[in-house]
Swiss-Prot record:
Changing residue 73 to Q: Loss of methyltransferase activity. This is Protein N-lysine methyltransferase METTL21D. Interacts with ALKBH6. Interacts with ASPSCR1 and UBXN6; interaction with ASPSCR1, but not with UBXN6, enhances VCP methylation. Keywords: Acetylation, Cytoplasm, Methyltransferase, Phosphoprotein, S-adenosyl-L-methionine, Transferase. It comes from the Eukaryota. Belongs to the methyltransferase superfamily. METTL21 family. Its EC number is 2.1.1.-. It comes from Homo sapiens (Human). One of its GO terms (biological process) is peptidyl-lysine trimethylation. Its main location: cytoplasm. The modification Phosphoserine is found at residue 8. One of its GO terms (cellular component) is protein-containing complex.
Length: 229
């Protein structure tokens, strides 16, 4: 994948800026740290999903599909996906834990000149009561959130609580084969199907350059309740 890294040898925090070129020639600059946990780096799934949002298959004709739509990103980390959506005209809330808010706000500030919608950062801890999010968003975006087994049920609770029946949830994840990863992925989909319908987006509909056979994009939508017959 043809994005680039910038770093400083004099930086004690070992920070790196990942540069992601958009289709219009502008670039997103994403600050990340080599230490500090999984949320401090830009994962490949975030790049794949960000570039998918730019594809003609997703964007549609005329105004972009995200223009003036409300978007919530879960597990934002560096905010890559949410920032891409904001540059495409969406009104975005990027969310993660308290300890990642400074990094999110730094990346928002670094890219604010590219934003054509709006973007703000908020704290959201999966599994806890939803506060400060008054209505279901049009879209929920999530990249590489299927990672820790202990976070699956809290994540799905938050998805169920914060989404509406018309919310389009787009989940991008890397399929990992080491250790317990296959079991974690299997459990995620077993739990997901209890309350949600989902479908996989074919690889040929991903960005032609930023794609990989082991990185998947799925559309998810909350199941509508059925009345007893």
């Amino acid at each position: 994948m043809a994005d680039t890294l910038e770093s400083s040898l004099e930086d004690p925090l070992r920070s790196f800026v990942r540069v992601l070129e958009k289709r219009d020639g502008t670039v997103l600059r994403l600050q990340q740290y080599s230490s500090g946990g999984v949320g401090c780096v830009v994962w490949d799934a975030a790049i794949v999903l960000s570039k998918y949002l730019e594809t003609p298959e997703f964007s549609g004709d005329g105004a972009h599909a995200l223009s003036r739509r409300s978007v919530l990103e879960l597990g934002s980390g560096t905010g890559a996906v949410g920032l891409m959506a904001a540059t495409l005209g969406a009104d975005v809330v990027v969310t993660d834990l308290e300890e990642l808010q400074d990094l999110l706000k730094m990346n928002i500030n670094m890219n604010k000149h590219l934003v054509t919608g709006s973007v703000q950062a908020k704290v959201l801890k999966w599994g806890e009561e939803i506060e400060g999010f008054p209505s279901p968003p049009d879209f929920i975006l999530m990249a590489d959130c299927i990672y820790y087994e202990e976070s699956l049920e809290p994540l799905l609770k938050t998805l169920k609580d914060i989404s509406g029946f018309e919310t389009c949830i787009i989940c991008c994840y890397e399929q990992r084969t080491m250790g317990k990863n296959p079991e974690i992925e299997k459990k995620y989909f077993e739990l997901l199907q209890l309350d949600f319908d989902f479908e996989k987006i074919p690889l040929e509909k991903h960005d032609e350059e930023y794609r990989s056979e082991d990185i998947h994009i799925i559309y998810i939508r909350k199941k509508k309740s059925k009345f007893p017959s």
